[in-house]
């Protein structure tokens, strides 16, 4: 029998883990910071590890807590493994529209996802740095759309600098995940998406431990 979600600490109904995947330098951290804090900086100091930000949004009358994870430099060493993908409900595959190699590597990231992520994870393709001058563009919009169509996923071009489509891309994948959750039966519940009263104490403990994480 399905258990109705209970708000942990009365501040959200669902917890959704999202991942940002892509080559180093495509702007994943900038997208994360723009969406979570509505700020932008070009002076990031890359750290080695995994970091995340949280933002709570409302969809269809439900408060959705988005936990968005950034690789924080690990992608340079190809060390992203199953542990990073565990529990992920959505993945944003990001490339730089001025860097064709980052676009070509999307196929490799897709293979990585197929190896480590759950079969039903939602995916979305993101062409970042769309604010750059057209003379610097290496990947036409049509080419990005064609790749997304090939994989059967949505496609957005974004700019963390100008805030172009940043809100739209995160809200789009969150909405798709929520819709999928409402269509699933009780078999989906062990994945830890619905927050029950029993989870509240554990969530509080985890939050305390996560407080030491810093964002760069």
UniProtKB/Swiss-Prot annotation:
Main function: Involved in membrane trafficking from the Golgi to the plasma membrane.
Record protein name field: Ras-related protein RABE1d
Binding annotation for GTP: 22-29, 70-74, 128-131, 159-160
Membrane topology: Lipid-anchor
InterPro entries in the record: P-loop_NTPase (IPR027417), Small_GTP-bd (IPR005225), Small_GTPase (IPR001806), Small_GTPase_Rab (IPR050305)
Gene Ontology process terms (BP): protein transport
Cellular localisation: Golgi apparatus membrane; Cell membrane
PROSITE patterns in UniProt: RAB (PS51419)
Species for this entry: Arabidopsis thaliana
Keywords: Cell membrane, Golgi apparatus, GTP-binding, Lipoprotein, Membrane, Nucleotide-binding, Prenylation, Protein transport, Transport
GO cellular component, one term: plasma membrane
Compositional bias (Low complexity): 200-216
Family assignment from sequence similarity: Belongs to the small GTPase superfamily. Rab family.
Annotated segments matching region Disordered: 196-216
GO terms for MF: GTP binding; GTPase activity
Lipid-binding residues (covalent, S-geranylgeranyl cysteine): 212-213
SMART domains per the UniProt record, alphabetical: ARF, RAB, RAN, RAS, RHO
Residue pairs linked by disulfide bridges in the UniProt entry: none
Renumbered ranges of motif Effector region: 44-52
